Structures are given as structure tokens and as C-alpha cells.
């Protein structure tokens, strides 16, 4: 049985009648304080909110259907779940971004089991990647699809980590240029070279694919050098899309990011991943399913829904009661920003060296005439 303790001294209390409304009154024998102990259902309501968000259930099917349920869970939409700080280094992590609108992107980092961090930004850029990565210990290898600004952030925050570009995304990039059914011999061969990247198992096969790529450029040199004029009369390569496809693979080979997963010094006897499927299928797909099940939410609530999903898939999420105590809310964040702005205005208004009024410039303290003053 749960014992009620005094809010003042912490000692065990006894029952002391009831109020006019019928609420149980409690008395502390030590300090003689009397009080009521109302039941707080916030934790139970938060658990209901969590179950609804991560399921296919519609609001009508929840207890307190419709408006009552929305009214009960509205306060939980004000909470911002914060990512943990990961201090233990890991062998492999995956990074990717999921766009919720044109100007809302959430960057996510995970390993094989858990979500490690997330960050909201307008689009993928080096500064946003740096903020995400600074809270996570540097891994041995990072798998990425080549998001904008990630290589720059990787050099700054995790300079010793090796980068593995997702081979499936490399293939998709080539397919975007050649299409799935190319009509030219050069296009068919380039498509097959890119497709074979998904089946490389050792460095010997990797070297063979690189040789095929070099030989492809030599074999079709005359064909690729053909020029044409655009609508403005300027000369352009006739097979520009094929050249872009070849350059996309050549760039990855030159950067040594296409076959990092074959490096035995990083594997420790285990097979390293060559694709970003863990985060694409294991996280992004589930996030899109959740947003589709609860479609119609505002962009702010969609962002927080993704945050909640990521938080409850971290290594050690807090309990519901602890979350309600420690996580920041819209109101607390607004209060913090308001205090920071007021402090900045105050600091700007205080005169600095050389800006303040000097008393002696406006008053005479001796009997010399004013004409003697500078």
C-alpha cells in the first residue's frame, strides 16, 4: 500500500477526515500540516498518448473518444523530447535525413539497435550535421547516402571516422541518369556496372569493377565526345547524362568511400554494411507509416511525433513520470529565449569603455573661465 508523506517534512501522514467535496484530508503528526493529496493522472494519460501515437488506432477508439481524448493529450504536444548524449564509441553508425515538408528536415543517427540522436533543420547542411554529431561519440565507420554538407561536418567532428557511401544510392544515382531501360550500348553497360556494385564481396571484385569503369570510358570515348547545340546555340555534350552517371561513380572511387565496408581493419571479423538500409527501412519507413496513420497533423506536431518515436527507440528512455518532470515544454523554451533576449538588450544598453557620459565634461569643478577648457 502506498503511504502518503508530508509535503513539508516528509514524514508519514494519517487520515484526518474529508473536505466538503468529499476529498480525503491528511494530517502530519510531526508538523501538524493538513493537506489533500489529489491524484495526478498525467502519467496514465501520457502512456495512452504514447500508445495511440505508435499504433494505427484513431482517436475515436481511445478512451474518452474524440474531443475528450484530444483535450487530455493536448498538453503532451507541448513537450519537446531531447536526444541523449552518447559517450561510448561504436563501430558502425548510420545517418540520414527525412523531410517532413519543403523547409523541415530531421537528421537522424542510429546504430543496429537504437536511435542515437536527431536534429531539426530547414535542410541538410554542414552546420546541422555538426550539431547532431557533436552529441555522439566518434564511430569507426559511418554509412551515409551522401547528404549535402555531411563530408564537411565529418572532417570537423569525426575526423578519424571512415565514410561508406551507400552503394544502393550510388546505383540509384546512375539509374536516374541512364533510366531503367537505357537504349544505347554505352548506357546499358554503365547501368550494369552500377548494378554490379550491389554484389561486391571482396577487394578483388571491387578492383575488377573499377577497371570496368575505366575501360568503359576508353571504349566509348568517341561516342561520349559527340557535341550538339542547345536552344541558345551553345555547344553541349550530346550524351551529357551518361557523362554525369560516369562522374558520379568516378567521384566516389576517387574519394575512397565506395568500398570502405571491405576494409578488414574496421570489420573485426564481422561483415560491415554497404548500404543505408538499416535507417531507410528500419526507421524512415516506420516514421512515414506513423505519419500516414495519423495524417492531418500540423507540421509542428509531425515534427514532435518523429521526435517521440526516436526518443522511445533510444538506448535508455526515461519513464513516463520522469519525462513529464524533466523534458522542456513550449512555455519553458519561450521563457528561456525571453530571458536571453532581455539580457542581450540589457548588455547592449550598458555603456562600454568610451561610450559613457563623463561628469567633468558637463560641469566645472574649478574657478578657471570656460575659455580655458579644451
Placement of each model-derived feature along the sequence:
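Short cysteine-rich clusters marking metal-coordination/redox-active sites
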Residues: 6-9, 28
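Short functional micro-motifs and their immediate structural scaffolds
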Residues: 11-14, 36
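Short linker/helix segments within small regulatory modules
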Residues: 15-25
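RNase H-like nuclease fold core
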Residues: 23, 27, 34, 64-160
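Acidic/histidine-rich catalytic cores and adjacent linkers
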Residues: 25, 32, 37-42, 48, ...
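Short, charged amphipathic recognition helices of the HTH superfamily
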Residues: 54-63
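Short hydrophobic/aromatic residue motifs in ordered secondary structure
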Residues: 99, 148, 172, 283-284
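Conserved beta-strand -> loop -> alpha-helix junction used to position metal-binding or nucleic-acid-contacting
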Residues: 145-194
